[in-house]
């Protein structure tokens, strides 16, 4: 990422901490997923930044010389979120125009259910997770 070994060690520690912290995550379907970012559009892009950063670490094979497991752990965590975002959003011709990504990766919103719009931060996070999966789809561990 930067070529600095001290930074890389801290980045690995921070990445693993994000994925395992009970303060930063909640359990859904027996899996750890990032907690609710909140509905404030000004404060809800943390996940998008985190997913981008995880993608950069997954693509950097030098990380393996410091920790042989972290890239796969990051990949699995990112894949889990992208899958929930993509699988739960209503992509039918009728539902798609009224569907919104929610602030939780597993709770989409829909004006058809009485929800009002969606957070721009939630959209950004969902888009980053889904786009990241295309960027790392060919990574081998």
Residue ranges and their predicted role:
Residues 1-2:
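Pocket-lining segment of extracytoplasmic ligand-binding domains
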Residues 6-8, 13-141:
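CBM-like carbohydrate-recognition segments
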């Amino acid at each position: 990422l930067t070529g600095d070994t001290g930074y890389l060690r801290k980045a690995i520690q921070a990445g693993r901490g994000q994925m395992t912290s009970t303060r930063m995550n909640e359990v859904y379907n027996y899996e750890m997923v990032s907690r609710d970012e909140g509905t404030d559009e000004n404060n809800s892009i943390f996940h998008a930044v985190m997913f981008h950063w995880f993608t950069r670490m997954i693509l950097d094979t030098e990380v393996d010389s410091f920790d042989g497991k972290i890239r796969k752990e990051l990949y699995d965590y990112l894949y889990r979120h992208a899958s929930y975002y993509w699988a739960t959003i209503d992509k039918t011709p009728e539902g798609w125009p009224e569907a919104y990504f929610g602030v939780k990766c597993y709770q989409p919103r829909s004006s058809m259910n009485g929800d009002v719009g969606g957070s721009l931060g939630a959209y950004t996070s969902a888009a980053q997770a889904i786009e990241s999966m295309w960027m790392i789809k060919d990574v081998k561990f």
